[in-house]
């Protein structure tokens, strides 16, 4: 995949030193786009049904579960480090309907997704997101 312009990559070192919450900020959107795109491509459902299915995968509990699976199965040491940095970041607030542990793990996964996207590691991002989508039957 080749992406240029505003959506194009930045230097890997620049991506690596970004605040993990900044990586999670962009990673949240990229994760959401992957899930929604997969659902649209595989389904003829109406928007409400698509949104319901997406919400089963795009939430802190599911993302925390995905982070644990990825960490155990396929992440490199560098990717585990980025996930850890995201998990250990202090966001200031946590949504009321989830555990702090799930929220932190989800933030770690979002940071990893953001890092891979910003640094232009699109093939690796695709591998990781394919595994996540497989886990949740998307």
Report each predicted region and the residues it spans.
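Double-stranded RNA-binding/processing signature
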Residues: 1-138
């Amino acid at each position: 995949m080749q992406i240029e312009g505003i959506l194009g990559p930045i230097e890997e070192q620049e991506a690596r030193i970004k605040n993990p919450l900044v990586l999670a900020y962009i990673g949240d959107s990229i994760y959401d786009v992957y899930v929604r795109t997969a659902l649209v491509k595989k389904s003829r459902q109406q928007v409400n049904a698509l949104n319901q299915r997406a919400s089963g995968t795009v939430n802190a509990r599911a993302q925390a579960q995905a982070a644990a699976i990825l960490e155990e199965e396929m992440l490199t040491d560098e990717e585990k480090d980025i996930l850890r940095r995201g998990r250990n970041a202090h966001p200031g607030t946590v949504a009321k309907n989830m555990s702090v542990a799930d929220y932190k793990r989800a933030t770690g996964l979002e940071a990893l997704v953001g890092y891979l996207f910003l640094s232009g590691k699109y093939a690796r991002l695709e591998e990781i997101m394919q595994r996540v989508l497989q886990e949740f039957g998307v």
